[in-house]
Structure formats: structure tokens, C-alpha cells
């Protein structure tokens, strides 16, 4: 028998498995199910996209959505789960949040309502769907080091690594990579951005930083967990004429920051894009898989998309469905 003929049955077998996988995905259903979707807030594009991805997919699969918005208050977000408990939903998708949600998750589980989380690891969650935060942090560390030629002084905005697990992973991985670059120094103390009106807050803090570190004393500014502060950082650099000697890196690559990166000569040189809509959609799919009796992993990791320079920013902007930049 020829090698080609030996391979044919195996190839047909793989095609059959692939067909079954596609069929299984097509067969997912939430018909007759009511799914609560709890969102910490809608102020940030990431949150809105994840919520949109989850709710649209639930409805596409035939389910009904009850949505609750925490207004970016973690305690309000936590308390909103009581509403979903009282409504006796069939399952809950909870997007973000801090430790305040844990007793609420326990109460839901005790009532027989399965909880699925987005960007929040919990002992009470059936599955957490999230970006690959390890790759996020390590990749931006490598990109920043490359942009600096392996040496320089770096300031970092790092307000949330202690409070939010995802932020801690991103920061720790970034810092871990920098151990291989002994000539890159992190300026102390680190900066702490506010969530509310973060671009303006970061702009003011960057102006203060620049007054303390004249040209030649500061080479980069990194935002450890997200990228909205980077908008204000770039503004401060442009206002002071420091946009040619200080580079900016961050994490998230939302439409606003990709637009800044796409500008010729932008100091915003590297980012790593998440796919929040896909994360929300996948979480909803996992709910349907659960009800179909499928075994789920504890965590589902969604790939991230590294971005370096204007051309890649334009390409990723289009890839993620934000439009097209000239």
C-alpha cells in the first residue's frame, strides 16, 4: 500500500472530527434559558465590548438576557448579583469585579445557579474566560525593551496590580522580562492612575514627572494594566515637546489608542490588543456548552494580538473590526 493511501483514512478521520466539532458548535443552544449578565461598568470600551459579545451571543443562541450595570462601583456590581439571584436566572456571566463579588458568587452557587466569570478567577466559577494575561505582560515587556535598545529609565503607571489579579499578572510578567535587561531601570516610586477620567489624570501626573526628569533622564512610560491613561501621557509629551525622546507602551489596544499609535512619529510605540467581544461571546458559548453537558476547562484563554508601530496599528484596527485607518 502506498504512503498516500495509508494517510487517506487518517485524513478522512480528521475531517470527520473537524466536521463533528463544527456541528457541535452549531448545535449550541440556550433556548428557554435566562442568563444574567453582570457588568462592573460601561465607561471603558473593553467592558462595553465584552458585555456586547456576551449578550448578543446569548440571544443568538435563543436565550434571554437580564443585564445589570455596576456603574464602575465594585460594591454596586457585587450587589447586582443579588438581583440576578432573586430573578432566579439559569446562569450568570459576571464581567470583572474585585473580591466583593465572592460571597455573591457563593450564594448563587448554593442556590444551584452556575456562575461564569470574565477576567475574574474565582473558586465559585465554573469557567473564567479571559485574555492570555501572561502573554500580554511578557510581550509588552519584550517590545518595550526592544524599543529602548535594552537600556533606559522607565516610569510605570501601576495602580491596580494589588487589587485585580489580571493586572498583577500583566505587571509581574512585564517586570519579569525586564530582569533580562539590567540596564533598564524602573523609576521609583511608581505612579498610580485614577480610573475615573484617567487620560486627564495621567496627563497631569506625566507633566509633573517630566518636570522632575528632564530630557535624557526618562526614556519610556509604561501603563501596566490597560491603556486609557496612555492617551493623557501622549498629550503631555506633545505639550512639552518630549514626544521624540520618551516612548509610551501599554496594554489593551482599544480603538482610541490604536488611532494614536497609527499617527506618523507617534511616541506610542507598542501595545498588545485584547479581543473583548470574542471573550464575552466565548463565555456565553461556554454557558451553552455547560448546559449541553460538555466538560469545560477552569479557564478559557483568548489569544492576544501584539501591536508595534503605525502600520501594525492600522492592520489590527481593521482586524478587530473597528474600521479602517488611512
Write out the residue ranges for each language-model feature.
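Short beta-strand elements in bilobed, periplasmic/extracellular small-molecule ligand-binding domains
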Residues: 59-70, 153-156, 178-199
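Short, solvent-exposed amphipathic alpha-helices that sit
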Residues: 46-61, 136-140, 165-186, 201-205, ...
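Hydrophobic alpha-helical segments within soluble ligand-binding/sensing domains
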Residues: 29, 77, 129-155, 199-206, ...
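Hydrophobic alpha-helical
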Residues: 82, 91-110, 195-260
Amino acid at each position: 500500500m502506498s504512503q498516500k493511501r495509508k494517510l487517506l483514512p487518517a485524513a478522512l478521520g480528521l475531517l470527520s472530527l473537524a466536521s463533528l466539532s463544527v456541528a457541535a458548535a452549531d448545535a449550541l443552544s440556550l433556548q428557554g434559558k435566562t442568563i444574567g449578565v453582570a457588568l462592573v461598568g460601561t465607561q471603558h470600551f473593553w467592558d462595553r465590548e465584552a458585555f456586547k459579545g456576551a449578550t448578543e451571543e446569548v440571544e443568538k443562541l435563543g436565550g434571554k438576557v437580564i443585564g445589570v450595570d455596576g456603574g464602575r462601583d465594585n460594591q454596586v456590581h457585587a450587589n447586582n448579583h443579588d438581583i440576578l439571584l432573586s430573578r432566579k436566572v439559569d446562569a450568570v456571566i459576571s464581567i470583572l469585579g474585585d473580591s466583593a463579588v465572592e460571597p455573591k458568587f457563593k450564594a448563587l452557587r448554593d442556590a444551584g445557579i452556575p456562575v461564569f466569570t470574565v477576567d475574574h478567577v474565582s473558586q465559585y466559577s465554573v469557567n473564567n474566560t479571559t485574555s492570555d494575561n501572561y502573554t500580554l505582560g511578557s510581550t509588552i515587556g519584550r517590545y518595550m525593551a526592544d524599543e529602548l535598545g535594552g537600556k533606559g529609565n522607565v516610569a510605570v503607571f501601576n495602580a491596580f496590580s494589588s487589587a485585580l489579579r489580571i493586572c498583577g499578572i500583566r505587571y509581574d510578567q512585564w517586570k519579569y522580562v525586564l530582569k533580562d535587561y539590567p540596564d533598564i531601570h524602573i523609576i521609583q516610586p511608581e505612579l498610580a492612575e485614577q480610573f475615573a477620567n484617567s487620560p486627564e489624570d495621567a496627563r497631569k501626573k506625566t507633566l509633573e514627572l517630566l518636570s522632575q526628569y528632564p530630557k535624557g533622564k526618562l526614556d519610556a512610560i509604561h501603563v501596566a494594566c490597560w491603556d486609557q491613561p496612555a492617551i493623557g501621557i501622549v498629550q503631555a509629551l506633545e505639550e512639552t515637546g518630549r514626544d521624540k525622546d520618551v516612548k509610551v507602551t501599554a496594554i489593551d489596544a482599544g480603538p482610541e489608542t490604536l488611532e494614536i499609535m497609527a499617527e506618523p512619529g507617534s511616541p506610542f510605540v507598542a501595545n498588545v490588543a485584547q479581543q473583548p467581544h470574542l471573550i464575552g461571546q466565548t463565555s456565553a458559548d461556554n454557558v451553552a456548552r455547560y448546559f449541553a453537558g460538555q466538560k469545560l476547562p477552569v479557564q478559557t484563554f483568548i489569544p492576544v494580538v501584539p501591536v508595534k508601530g503605525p502600520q501594525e496599528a492600522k492592520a489590527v484596527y481593521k482586524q478587530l473590526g473597528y474600521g479602517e485607518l488611512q
